[in-house]
Structures are given as C-alpha cells and as structure tokens.
Amino acid sequence: MSIADKLKTIAENEQKVFEAGKKSEYDRFWDNYQDKGNRTDYGSGFGSCWTSDIFKPKYDIVPISAYMMFNNSKMAIDLVEHLEKLGVALDFSKATSTQYMFQSSSFTRVGIIDVRASTNSRPLDSTFANCMKLITIDKIYLKTGAVGEFNATFTNCVALENVTFEGSITKNGLNVQWSTKLTKASIISIVNALSNTTSGLTVTLSKTAVNTAFETSTGANNGSTSTEWTTLIGTKSNWTISLA
C-alpha cells in the first residue's frame, strides 16, 4: 500500500471514529434528557436557547406537562417537517397543561394540538400569543364543553393563514383579529366550531381576512357583505360574530 493510500485509510478511519463519537454523545444526551423515552414533564423544555441543529430528539415526545414547552423558541422552522425527518412524533393527547406552550415562538408550522386531556380551565391560554411567524396550525382538538376562554390564544398571530378546529367552541374570547391572512377554509372551520347551544357569546375575526376570503370576485374585497358570508354566519345566529 502506498503512503498516499495509507494516509487516505487513516483519514477515513478517523472520520469513522469521529462520527461514532458524535453518535455516542447524541445518544447519551437524549437518553438522559428524555429519560430514554419516558419523560412526560416537558414544561419549559425547549425554550429560547434551543436551535434546530440541537433540537433533534431521539424519542417520541408525549408530554403530560407541556406548560411553556416551546415558549420563546427562536427556531423558525416547520416543526412538523423537522420532526418527521427525525422519525419522531409529537403527541399532545395526554397533555394536562398546555398554556403558553408556543408563546412568542418562531415556528412557521405546528402540527396537531390536542387539549382534550387538559385539566386546566383555560388550556389555550396564550398558547400561540405573539407567534408572529406562525402560518399553519394543522388542527386544534378542543375539549368539548370544558374549554375555558380563549384568553390571548392568538394575539399578534399576524402571519396565521391555516387553522382547523375539531370540537365545539362554547366559551367567550376567541379573537383572531390580527390574522388578516386567514383562508376561507380556516374561517369556515372557526364558524362551524361555534356551539349551537350557547348564547350571548362573541367571537372576533379579521374584517380584512373575511373581505378577501369571501370576496365575490378577484380584488372586490367585499366578502363581509357577500351572500356566502352572511349565509354562513346566519347558521350561528346565537353568536355575535364581530369583525375588527
């Protein structure tokens, strides 16, 4: 074997040793941080110090406490896509505490938010407040009949376009007036989720979003007076649907 070949072999072996060392450190860190997949308390678990290069969990994340879990995260990524590439699931179906979960974070997309197991009277309290880069929430499963007020849930969600609700909205406080880019499908989902059995309650939407989504022709910007819109909100006459 020539000297050049020997040097090449040494370099290749060094790289293999280096990669093995990195894998060992990765395993050691995440085995400890996630308790080998048994961790359930993720309160404030992934805050402002985490980057997408570091946030590469080894195990599925199934929190019981998700309080402030991603609060103030600076990761401006599609969270769903990021975790799918890692083969890791994020499952909130057992979470009993979800307040402030994504507050002031920089994610562009989050997946399924399930608050049906919540034991808090306000499970969506400030959950997405000040998420100014958030475009898509795949779905929010509501705890029908037990969800408290939507206190500041979507405050300053100025980029939000897509959100789907599953369940019934039975309390005051849902306000998405900052979300001027909401799609027609998202607005319809909100209206359809409004309880048919409550009365005297108010929901606030963006007039700009409604005007654009329900406009009668491109550029007309008249959706809030369109027949389609008035017919839709007519199905929820027990609610005050305010446009701001």
Enumerate the language-model features and the residues they cover.
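Short, low-complexity N-terminal tether/leader segments at secretion or assembly junctions of large
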Residues: 1-28
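Negatively charged
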Residues: 18-244
